[in-house]
Amino acid sequence: MALVGIVMGSDSDMPVMAKAADILEQLGISYEMTIISAHREPDVFFEYAKSAEEKGFKVIIAGAGMAAHLPGMCAAIFPMPVIGIPMHTTSLGGRDSLYSIVQMPTGIPVATVAINGGANAGILAAKILATSDAALLERLKDYTKNLKESVQKKDARLQAVSYTHLRAHETCADL
């Protein structure tokens, strides 16, 4: 049974939503991913949101661009946490999506990550689930420890080769 529902409004959102799925997989969290347009398929959307709780979802990660009603409507129907991912758009750089998701009325909150913030949405979903799963909490602590060690290794490399040498390369990994 999937613990997290990942829903997006368009297949063009897949690269961002895949980052959330990747994090969930790394942490051993089951999920179900689907594409539903809240505007073009309202009947399909309503059935998805209404049935999410009985499917066993504890969190929904919803990504959408432009008018971005998908996350807010999920939050209006699904009684548990919804994480919204505003998608970058060509017309307004994603600000339209961001404002649509964060400006929710009282009583219908959507936890919102950065524009195209798929990875952080996955991490936030994991943190929500970890409040009642000690083993997952330990995996999250390990994940955070690995992030810290990665930064420390990059700094050690920078100190070893100097900024002048590094400047000619894109990242420490390119050396």
Annotate each predicted stretch with a short phrase.
Residues D13-M17, P42, A67-M73, L92-R95, ...:
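Short glycine/serine/threonine-rich phosphate/pyrophosphate-binding segments
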Residues T164-T171:
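Conserved small/polar residues in nucleotide/adenosyl-binding loops
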Residues V4-E32, S37-A38:
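Glycine-rich phosphate/diphosphate-binding loop of Rossmann-like nucleotide-binding domains
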